[in-house]
Amino acid sequence: MGETEGKVIAQNKKARHDYFIEETFEAGMVLQGTEIKSIRAGRANLKDSFARVSNGEVYLHNCHISEYEQGNRYNHEPTRARKLLLHKKQIDTLIGQTQQKGYTIVPLKIYIKNGFAKCLIGLGKGKKTFDKRETLRRRDAKREVERALKEKNR
């Protein structure tokens, strides 16, 4: 649903390895002043982060945004829960899908678009170990084919 246009700040590379991403949503983020300054400086990390719906609102948990270096005593807490801004229809879709067994909301990347910090979240279904191995095999086979075609064209 949402394609990134701006500068990518942080990516969750493990998300596509651990989950089948079925649908993506672009969400705005409610941030404090020092948080947006740290994000613009590229000091955000999505490792081990997840999103959860509570009271009809979506929150991003465990997203680490480092404290701003020039911040004073009013600096933000690095891993606090941050509210994500979505349309009501999108939230209802997420609520309905996450109540099914095995589905979760996974943050994929944080980026700046038109001056605003956005978070691309995906509706993911957990992969089993054999699915992960199959994905790796498929990717390796694709690399081998591309390598063979490249050498053939020389």
UniProtKB/Swiss-Prot annotation:
Name the record gives this protein:
SsrA-binding protein
Q: What biological function has been recorded for the protein in this entry?
A: Required for rescue of stalled ribosomes mediated by trans-translation. Binds to transfer-messenger RNA (tmRNA), required for stable association of tmRNA with ribosomes. tmRNA and SmpB together mimic tRNA shape, replacing the anticodon stem-loop with SmpB. tmRNA is encoded by the ssrA gene; the 2 termini fold to resemble tRNA(Ala) and it encodes a 'tag peptide', a short internal open reading frame. During trans-translation Ala-aminoacylated tmRNA acts like a tRNA, entering the A-site of stalled ribosomes, displacing the stalled mRNA.
Q: Where are the transmembrane segments?
A: none
**Which cell locations does it reside in?**
Cytoplasm
Describe the family membership recorded for this protein in Swiss-Prot or TrEMBL: Belongs to the SmpB family.
- Region span, Disordered: 134-154
Pfam families in the record: SmpB (PF01668)
Q: Which keywords, in A-to-Z order, does the entry hold?
A: Cytoplasm, RNA-binding
The record, for InterPro entries, names: SmpB (IPR023620), SsrA-bd_prot (IPR000037), SsrA-bd_prot_CS (IPR020081)
Can you name a GO cellular component term? cytosol
Database matches in NCBIfam families: PRK05422.1, smpB
Identify the CDD domains for this entry: SmpB
